[in-house]
Amino acid sequence: MKGVGIDLPQQDFIDMKDAGIEVISTEWGMEQRVGMARAFLDQAQSAGLKVIMDGGFSSRAWGFTDSDWQRLPEGKRPVWQKERVQGWINALKDHPAIYAWDISNEFGENLPSGAGAGCPDWPNSRITIEQLKQARADVLEADPTRPIHARMYGGDKGEFPDHVKAMLDNKIADIISLNLYSNYLANNKLQWPTVIADAGAFFVNAIKKRQPEVKVWMSISAFEYPKQFQRTTAASLERDIDEAVKIQELDGVSFFCWGPVDQWDMKSDWYLPKSGPDLWTVIKNKIKN
């Protein structure tokens, strides 16, 4: 389960575990206090859950400040913060609930220098492959015991863009979360509601062809974000899950998101148990069956 908020009751963790969820991840990271992060990890550990933690996907890991979201200085680009990242990892790595370290969300598209923030320099302000190679090396230097996780999305059905090919060829990640959200909107229209049925297997197989040993988890939409993502329906969620599990090369399925998400690039009061109880029921039933 992705996008799990930092300040939740223990029952949420218990409910996820009881439903069959094994691993959770967050949208928050190094902007939070270490004490808060450890408390979250304690909750997960108590419920028997593992956590994918920020190891470099957050804006702080790339040298950005809160004010950059409101007004990015002209020409400011991502700069990897080795000391900050390794300090964060060293403060948390002894916790047994940590499953992996997440070093990238869509090549920085969701950073202040990214397309999601309306940066006019995009895609020139994209995180580079050399930076991701350095990020991987530095995270593994601090904690060589856990795998590296990265997030990416599929484009049009066809060749991957060069930066995605380079990520796979350089084995940046040990686990890839492939974000295929069928509820994506543009101009108030769903753009590709059948993306998983149409191209899910293609994307997974293309990833495995370039990096055979990588684990691929498909991330499926179970949320709403006004003007960008239409509320997932129970029917579309059932369809997406059914199509995903047909893909033989797929190693796992995840869902975005539990919520709430309160980050600079995405503020949402979406909270799956209350905002999408019908979707949570679908997820639980599908895992059970």
Language-model-derived ranges and their functions:
Residues 9-69, 120-150, 168-169, 190-205, ...:
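Aromatic-lined substrate-binding rim segments of carbohydrate-active enzymes
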Residues 12, 147, 156-228, 271-279, ...:
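Glycoside hydrolase catalytic-domain groove-lining segments
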